[in-house]
């Protein structure tokens, strides 16, 4: 978990099912607070929902750092299917483009991270880069993400793991 040390440090849809919210929200956060570093943590499915917004980053020179957690799945949908629908999986595997090459076509620097030991150097490079940056981080295909807000619930009912609610 990431421990925030100051207020007004996170923008979230709060589990309201707004897949694709992240990239436009990060762009808006950076435009609204240009002096702050804005990092977007997003899955490959969520990024693909609004990937055309990379054009906004290019056109307006928005310095957003994108940490793409790439598992080649619609990960949260798959997680819901596993936890709440008795592992009846449907339509969640994804065949993805080369995200670093795609970012480059928008003038955005990028890098692939395939092993954990590459991560520290890659993050340092991303944060020191002046301008937008996409860090494509390969993560476990079937890993789950917590905390999470179950569908139809609210942030006061977050799940901390498979068996524990807050």
Describe each PLM feature range.
Residues 1-166:
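Thiamine diphosphate
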